[in-house]
Amino acid sequence: MRETCGWGTGDPLMTAYHDAEWGVPVHDDRLHFEFIVLEGVQAGLSWRTVLHRRDAYREAYDNFDPVKVAKYTEADTERIMAHPGIIRNRRKIEAAVKNARAFLAVQKEFGSFDKYVWGFVGGKQKINSHKSFSEMPAETEESRAMSKDLKKRGFTFVGPTICYAYMQAAGLVNDHLTECYRWKEVQR
């Protein structure tokens, strides 16, 4: 049996996410927006809770199309609040809409959100060499810089810990444990 990070075992959806997505470098703006929203939703919750509702979030937020989400009105907020498959937190729903508008402004300024966000790690994946989760930080200098800049640009629910979780998910950092078979596979 191959070694993994261990956090995805026992839950098929978490295992699939660990094995196929987590830490894989993202260069698609729609997926960047999806991770920004979902990591914000996760604040105060477990990733497992959010991941098990991911399809409902995709449905509620027009597959995380930032152009569509940026146009949402109060009626859309109410529609999402009534969606039975998501965690109904008005502040987080309103943050997703606000973040979509800020996301589009970043795209316009930099040509893509991808180009902007990868700038925080010098354009290449930061490869960590953790042997246990106790070595892994909750935030880093890069996630603090990202958080500060995103907030300056109008984003919300983007504190340094949320930004670090986003960086892990979107592959800006490789935080697979060195014993995990994915540690080498996701390095790009």
Where are these regions (language model features)?
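HhH-family (HhH-GPD) DNA N-glycosylase catalytic core used in base-excision repair
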Residues: M1-R188
